[in-house]
Amino acid sequence: MKLILRADVDALGSLGDIVTVKAGYGRNYLIPQGLAMPASEANLKQFELEKRKLQEMADNLRTQAEGLRDKLAEVEVKIEVRVGEGDKLYGSVTAVNIADALAEMDFDIDRRKILLSDPIRSLGEYDIEIKLHPEVRGEVKLVVAKVGGPVEEEPAEEVEAPAETEVAEDAEEATEA
């Protein structure tokens, strides 16, 4: 079945390409999704009229993706996880976890757009690549940390010390009175 692509389709072609696909794929997916139309003479003429509008829409989407890329470059995503002995994670950090953390920060990123070769299984900082558009990729900084973060004991001791001296001073004042 010959079709004219009305949008960029991964592993198939880009806007305006005439491609040959299996009939079921064309009839059941590409045409109903509005990604393609049959390659007939009438459709070719109609497509030439629509092509400018579709190209403007594609350019608009690319511009939005570039803006999102710039915003994501400034963001640091922190995911806190439980760890065992030797700072070994219970489980792993996956694209779903990263997408959820981004959603909490008001970034609507599909988990399938987050490019992880393997799940993250150790603490640290990572640069995660995100496919925002077929032509635009962005990066976000991910920090995987322990639940509760690092605990600093020195400030806690300083806070307790004045309280003990105040109690001692109150006790001295009570005995003098």
UniProtKB/Swiss-Prot annotation:
Region feature (Disordered): 151-177
SUPFAM superfamilies linked to this entry: L9 N-domain-like, Ribosomal protein L9 C-domain
GO MF term set: rRNA binding; structural constituent of ribosome
GO BP annotations, alphabetical order: translation
UniProt superkingdom: Bacteria
GO CC annotation: ribonucleoprotein complex; ribosome
Pfam short name (any one): Ribosomal_L9_N
Assigned keywords, A-Z: Ribonucleoprotein, Ribosomal protein, RNA-binding, rRNA-binding
Protein purpose: Binds to the 23S rRNA.
Similarity-based family: Belongs to the bacterial ribosomal protein bL9 family.
Name by which UniProt lists this protein: Large ribosomal subunit protein bL9
Lineage of origin: Bacteria, Pseudomonadati, Thermodesulfobacteriota, Desulfovibrionia, Desulfovibrionales
